[in-house]
Each structure stands twice: as C-alpha cells, then as structure tokens.
Amino acid sequence: MSEKLDFITKNNLWTDKQRDAADKVLAEIDSLGLEMIRLSWADQYGLLRGKALSVAALKAAFSEGSEVTMAPFSFNLVSEWVFNPFTAGGGFGIDEFDELGGVPSVVMVPDPTTFKVLPWADKTGWMLADLHWKSGEPFPLCPRGIMKKAVKSLSDEGYLFKCGIELEWYLTKIVDRSLSPESLGAPGVQPDAIQVQPVAQGYSYLLEYHLDQVDDIMSKVRKGLLELNLPLRSIEDELAPSQMETTFDVMEGLEAADAALLIKSAIKQICSRHGYHATFMCKPAINGFSVASGWHMHQSLVDKDTRKNLFIPSEGEVVSPLGRAYAGGLLANGSAASSFTTPTVNGYRRRQPHSLAPDRRAWAKENKAAMVRVISATGDPASRIENRIGEPGANPYLYMASQIVSGLDGIKIKRDPGGLQGAPYGAQVPMLPTALAEALDALEHDSELFRSCFGDTFIKYWLQLRRSEWARFLDAEGAEAAEPTGAVTQWEQKEYFNLL
C-alpha cells in the first residue's frame, strides 16, 4: 500500500527552496521560543488577512495547509456583501465560480521563505501564504498568485523584474481612536475616521528640522523595518506637513511585492502602538493636507542568467532598445492598467497638472511631470524607468503585475513610445483616466492583455467589485464630488483613512 501524501506534497505546492526553508524556520521558531505565527495573505485591496497560529498548528500547516474562509473576497472595505454568497455561484455571476456558494473555505499554503520575526510583537512570527482550492489548484482571486504568474511570464522570456519601492504617506498623531459605540460602524456602514492632528506645520520639502520633529516615532519605524531585514534606503520629509517618504533598495520580482506589503503593514502597526496613525490613503480629508501621496515604481529588467541590467543605454541612447519598448508598453497600457495602479476613488485626486503627478501618458528624461520618467546614463548599471502613476494605497501584487504585463507587451510587439516630452503637462498625448469609473471602462474596453495573466475570472470580479465602490461613492456624494479637483469627501475619509 502506498503512503498517503500530504496536501502540499501531493499537489507539488512547494519548491526545494521552500522545503529547505521550512526546516530552518521550525528550528528558528524553537530556538527563539516563539509561540504564535501570523499566517497572512493579501486580499483584493492589498490588506493583510489571516490567522495567528500556534506552533503546533503551523507545523500541521507545513503539511496540509490551513483552511480559511474566502468570505473577505465577497466583501467591500466596510464588510458589506458585494457578492451574495447565498445565491448560486456565490453571487459572482461567473460560471467558473459555481463552487463559491455558501462561503466555502480555501487552503492557506505557507511560504516558509517569507518568514520573519516581528520585533514589536511578543514571541510572534509572521509568514505569507498562497491561497489554493482544496483540489490544490490556485485560487483565482489570490493577488499573490497573479504576481507569480506575471513573474513567470517574464522568466519564460529570459528576464527578471527589478523594482525599487518609493512610498509617500501621511504620519499623524492620534487624538481620538473613534471607539465610541456610535463611531464603530456596521456591516455596510462606514466607521468614523480616526481623529488625528498633524506632526509638523508648513510646506517645506526635505526640511531636516521636520525629520527631527518626528524622530521619536520614526526611529522606532526605522528600527522595526531594519530588524525585518527590509532594505530601507531613506526616510524623507515630503512637501506637505506630516507627509513622509520611505524608499528601499532594489529588490527582485515577488520579493519586492511581498516587501511592499510588509512595509506598509509594519509602518501602520508600529505607529499605532505608539499613538500615531500612518495612512497610505492618497489624499486625506484633513485641512492643510493638500498634496496627494504617490507610489513611484522604479523598474528595470535584468538577464535571467547574467543578471545584467538590460535597460543600460549605449552612447546616444536615452535607454536601451529593450527599455524603450518596455516604456512603450507602460504608456500604451497606462489607461487600461489604471485601476491596478490607482484603485481607489480617492487616488484620482492626484491626477492634476503641475502637481508632480502625471495626468497624461507622456514619457521624459528626468522630468517628474511625466508618467514614465527615464533615469539613465550611458553605461550606468542603475539605469531604470520610473512609473509615477501609482497611489500608495494600491495592492502591491496587482500594481507590479500590471507593470510586468504592460512592459512585456511592449517588448513583444516592439511598441514605440514616440519622442521624449520636454513639457509633459502640455504634451499632445492621450490623457490618463481622471476617475475610477473611467479607469474601469478603459480596462474593460482593452482587457485582453490583462486577462491573459490576471485571468478572465479575476478581471470580471475586479470590474464588478470596483464598480460597486464607485456606485457607493456616487450614492453618498453625488456626481459633482467626483471631479478630481474637488474637495476630498467625508465618504473617502471614512472609507480609506483608517485601513489603507
């Protein structure tokens, strides 16, 4: 009689590297005396969800995985059913989702290579998981699974994705956590936003004095990030009062997306423990916070075998021919990818001319008004392309996957980005979407490319999910409030400020 194989082995869900890491993780857990491990996964919004497992439960999960409800994928940000799970197919209206009726469980499969010890939580570790059906097949709504597919598509062509993370966010001091019964919200009812006050005054970019004013909390953030072995490069004072920027050294592929997820979660948790609130909401509805935050993604491709940067220009070039085609792909697909780079209603407040954020699909050399900014020099190994389109509240996996898919499309069909723009805000090129609804229409109209990687099921799901968010906003605030130059509404503040 053959020996029964465990779930992970039977379905071949771990690589040799993951199996080796699993043994080392269990030994480290034992030597450090850890008691709980947070096994987490990213939901559709890029928020971490999961369970805190005992060591015994984690050991079992290293063989059989750990079951978890897929209910969060049916909810919006205020835990209202977008998809009714008690109807046929779970309310998704997608043939492939017949098995989703009744909110079934999926299986969290731990990735031991992502293990960290949380420095701010007592005897606690942290690990990411992939989501699978009980059949062993990947769960099609899992954002990390989508990123893994995108990375593989690049690898199949002989390339590796390199990414530098540059996140802007707002740091505030908590005045009232809004925990009174009338402030808590309910399923489908937004809770009140946390009440905060700024930590600095005045608009003064890169002011060292502002950094010193927040050193007490930012030293704790710095310490936490470094103890997590995240490659922190800089902490900077951004233009608006209380606006920060954190940058990180270049990372590769899936590692970069995993890191972005942990970076945002770590900053929020550390700040909250010390009476501060960090938000990656693009533009909070707070007087004086008139500058929107961005997520600028520095990216390049390297040869899979030699690890040589393939964007390095030769004499007389702005960027290599491969890099030029990649930039052409980012530009050509910029509107269709917009709901992945800028997925919230609030994120489109940023798309205004002369705001250091792009409003059209232009590219330029060292110009921060452009969507695609080329940073390069002849023979420079750090040559790269920066896409300035994104908001910090974006899901890291979907944002990065959209870049890979768009850039690889440019390479495969040799897309020409046209001439460099000397004045991007006046360039005669297509405009970017100025509202979430417009971005979703662009994706639906030109979705074949993204369906090939994200999957037809996910694209259908995403369009319905985000359109319901837009409809809720219009119902609450009206069409006039959707103008990108308009004031940030209280609906946006309640929807995004606490969680993102």
UniProtKB/Swiss-Prot annotation:
A cellular component annotation (GO) from this entry: membrane
Activity's dependence on pH: Optimum pH is between 8 and 10.
Pfam families xrefs: Gln-synt_C
Keyword Ligase: yes
Residues annotated as domain GS beta-grasp: 32-136
InterPro entries, per the entry: Gln_synt_N, Gln_synt_N_sf, Gln_synth/guanido_kin_cat_dom, Gln_synth_cat_dom
A single GO molecular function term of this UniProt record: acid-ammonia (or amide) ligase activity
Keywords linked to the UniProt accession: ATP-binding, Ligase, Nucleotide-binding, Plasmid
Sequence ranges assigned to domain GS catalytic in this UniProt record: 143-500
Enzyme class: ligase
GO BP term (any one): glutamine biosynthetic process
Temperature section of the record: Optimum temperature is 40 degrees Celsius.
EC number: 6.3.1.18
Gene3D superfamilies in the cross-refs: Glutamine synthetase, N-terminal domain, Glutamine synthetase/guanido kinase, catalytic domain
Catalysed conversion reaction: aniline + L-glutamate + ATP = N(5)-phenyl-L-glutamine + ADP + phosphate
Role, per record: Involved in the initial oxidation of aniline to catechol by the release of its amino group. Catalyzes the ATP-dependent ligation of L-glutamate to aniline to yield gamma-glutamylanilide (gamma-GA). AtdA1 has a broad substrate range and is able to convert the following anilines, including chlorinated and methylated forms of aniline: aniline (100%), o-chloroaniline (92%), m-chloroaniline (69%), p-chloroaniline (92%), o-methylaniline (40%), m-methylaniline (27%) and p-methylaniline (45%).
UniProt record similarity statement: Belongs to the glutamine synthetase family.
Oligomeric and partner information: Homohexamer.
Name by which UniProt lists this protein: Gamma-glutamylanilide synthase
Organism encoding this protein: Acinetobacter sp
